[in-house]
């Protein structure tokens, strides 16, 4: 009876560890995929949005301090 209990405890711990490592991997890839989708969804920044890494849309000018300019 004691051996069966030990085997069950080890099996539960192993399955829990497998689920945790799988969940971490999925979340990691989801974050990368999400940031790529956001980056690809906007080709220019609208009025009031940052223009440090993305150019302003037509008719807007990038103005402001070097650390955080915005499109006006």
Curated annotation (Swiss-Prot):
It is found in: Secreted. Residues 24-42 form a propeptide. Residues 1-23 form the signal peptide. It holds the Pfam family Conotoxin. InterPro entries: Conotoxin. Disulfide bonds join 44-57, 51-62, 56-71. Expressed by the venom duct. GO terms for molecular function: ion channel inhibitor activity; toxin activity. The presence of a 'disulfide through disulfide knot' structurally defines this protein as a knottin. This is Conotoxin VnMKLT2-011.
């Amino acid at each position: 009876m004691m051996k069966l209990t030990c085997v069950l405890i080890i099996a539960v711990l192993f399955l829990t560890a497998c689920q945790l490592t799988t969940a971490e991997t999925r979340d990691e890839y989801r974050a990368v995929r999400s940031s790529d989708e956001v980056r690809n969804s906007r080709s220019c920044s609208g009025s009031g949005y940052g223009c440090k890494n993305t150019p302003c849309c037509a008719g807007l000018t990038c103005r402001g301090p070097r650390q955080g300019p915005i499109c006006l």
